Amino acid sequence: MAKLLRDLSREKEYNQHARGPEHMTINGQVVKVSDMVVHRFRMGDVEDPVLYAAQPIHAWQQTEAGRFVMEHAMESPWWVRHMDPMDYGYQFAIVARMKESDQTFYSLKYVGTTN
């Protein structure tokens, strides 16, 4: 039973970059900046999930959507790992902090596509 409980201190470590929405002044204009999950993928039960996650993350960065995020993110995107209770593996999400206008463009162009 003890192994099934979530280790909240470890989860906090993975989510340390997450912040709420904020407003910034960029080129004399006030823009809203917030976090957005830009890519998700699953991984089976492997010995070192961080090591095995490097390839899918790198492959996504080479896509058109990945290049857009890397160019328009306000700071370096980060990944978050969670346990996947459905298949005893892991779920990874890549999160980026972007302007609201860039988030809208990304959602309209890339969400729901294979890119």
Feature annotation, model-predicted:
Residues 2-89:
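Structured alpha/beta or helical-core interaction and ligand-binding surfaces enriched in interleaved
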Residues 81-115:
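Short, compact, well-ordered microdomains
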